[in-house]
């Protein structure tokens, strides 16, 4: 999906992110990622798009926002790879 030249990637449940703004997609189970999530929550930079489901990936943007997604890290990586090929 594109929006005036910006490619959008589906994060699940009808939520999208501009692909060029994403810096990293990481697994949420490590201690550093838990700290990152808590710091982002405390600083108002956390966006939760899990709709109450378990967090399976964390997306970090160039604006330092942290997005929680219920989609597996590997699946998110594949979606970004597919967007790069289009």
UniProtKB/Swiss-Prot annotation:
It holds the Pfam family RemA-like. Belongs to the RemA family. This is Putative regulatory protein DVU_0899. The lineage of its organism: Bacteria, Pseudomonadati, Thermodesulfobacteriota, Desulfovibrionia, Desulfovibrionales.
